[in-house]
């Protein structure tokens, strides 16, 4: 699927990787801690009524703009495809 890959926020929010595992799509977020280490969290993506949601405990709507190759998270803002691998 075209959405797979590394994504970075246009507004300095945590980056994420979208990937497929065992037939399910997942998102791993990367957040830098105050000590400078990278903390990761992985969430499953589900589909409800034709909409994609990241299951974080809250409903985070994920919309992919194929024409502009952008992802919009609501809440969370706009993400663009990363040109370089995310530091893990």
Regions found by a protein language model. Name each.
Residues 1-8, 19-20:
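N-terminal helix-cap/turn-to-beta initiation motif at the start of protein domains
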Residues 9-16, 24, 49-88:
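Beta-sheet ligand-binding and adhesion/scaffold domains
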Residues 12-50:
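N-terminal glycine/threonine-rich, aromatic-flanked beta-hairpin/loop signature
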């Amino acid at each position: 699927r075209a959405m797979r890959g590394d994504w970075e926020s246009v507004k300095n929010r945590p980056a994420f990787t979208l990937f497929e595992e065992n037939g399910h799509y997942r998102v791993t977020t990367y957040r830098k801690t105050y000590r400078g280490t990278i903390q990761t969290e992985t969430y499953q993506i589900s589909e409800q009524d034709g909409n994609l949601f990241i299951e974080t405990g809250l409903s985070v709507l994920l919309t992919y703009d194929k024409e502009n190759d952008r992802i919009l998270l609501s809440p969370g803002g706009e993400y663009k495809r990363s040109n370089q691998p995310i530091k893990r």
